[in-house]
């Protein structure tokens, strides 16, 4: 009886130690990068800085930056992304995978975002990468006055 208890104790000890094996296989390192970005009314190319994870875009004065449609958002193949819901016009219709053109998106997708402030975008692979997108709107107005006496 005593030998049965010893064998049972040894068996349970080995089983308990075996259950403590740690999974130390690391996740692959896949960098989350945005490779192309465009919005409606964009003037020039987007400035994508992969080191600081920032994007700067300039748009003309004819667009509403509070409901600006993203027309191209290309990320590396393994990545998904999310834009903070407070910036999306329709958060439940915003895509989570990159696209080269609006035609690539399913019907009903809405890519409009409020860019009146810098917008954070979280790219996810096996790691998370925080990107910041800034849209600058150039508003240029020229006023001409007839019969002006002195140069302005």
Regions found by a protein language model. Give the residues of each.
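Beta-rich interaction/scaffold domains
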Residues: 20-152
């Amino acid at each position: 009886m005593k030998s049965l208890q010893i064998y049972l104790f040894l068996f349970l000890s080995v089983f308990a130690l075996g259950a403590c094996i740690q999974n130390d296989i690391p996740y692959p390192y896949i960098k989350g990068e945005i490779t192309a970005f465009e919005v409606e009314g964009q003037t020039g190319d987007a400035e994508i800085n992969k080191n600081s994870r920032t994007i700067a875009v300039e748009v003309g004065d004819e667009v509403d930056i509070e409901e600006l449609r993203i027309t191209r958002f290309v990320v590396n193949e393994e990545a998904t992304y999310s834009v903070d819901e407070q910036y999306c016009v329709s958060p439940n219709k915003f895509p989570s995978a990159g696209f080269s053109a609006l035609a690539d998106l399913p019907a009903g997708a809405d890519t409009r975002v409020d860019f009146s402030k810098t917008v954070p975008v979280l790219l996810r692979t096996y790691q998370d990468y925080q990107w910041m997108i800034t849209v600058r709107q150039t508003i240029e107005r020229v006023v001409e006055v007839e019969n002006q006496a002195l140069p302005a």
